[in-house]
Amino acid sequence: VMPPVRSKEDVSFVWNTIKQNQIDTVGTDHVANQLKLKLDGNTVWDALAGFPSIGVSLALLLSEGVNKNRITISQLTNLTSLNAAKIFGMYPAKGSLEPNSDADITLVDLKKEHKATSELFGGFSDYTVYQDWKLKGWPVKTIVRGEIVSEDFQVVGKQGYGKLVPRKTMST
């Protein structure tokens, strides 16, 4: 992550800034690499940037944010959906549950506890920097355009169900 957020003071500053609605979105530096590829090189400057994190990003925000009263569930929704949809010109098709929107929704269980592992999400990556973190609050079901596409860490949607979402151009 560039820049890294390491100190307790930095972490506290980020959460307080989010709580005050001064940060619009939270993203990941997700790069689905295997550890041997990431570390392939002689110096830190040779290492590949980023790390696999998209699979735990929502659980981290639920566990460390909502469940520790650093942010509200409404703020989380804005950070992860509404604001991004508006910024990227996809609102109201995305980021909204209003009539004529796609009404995509992720159901979460704020009490579900699970350890983060690379095996949890399958795929190419064989590591996570959050290995064995016990997180409380996980997504349990994702619905896209009325169809369940993910349930209990498993993709259950039909291949090819994705759809291009046209963006509105921004006027300058």
Which residues are covered by each model-predicted region?
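Short, flexible, glycine/charge-rich loop motifs used to bind or transfer phosphoryl groups or to couple energy/partner
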Residues: 14-16, 95-96, 132
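C-terminal cap of metal-dependent C-N hydrolases
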Residues: 39-43, 102-165
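Short, solvent-exposed cationic patches
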Residues: 164-172
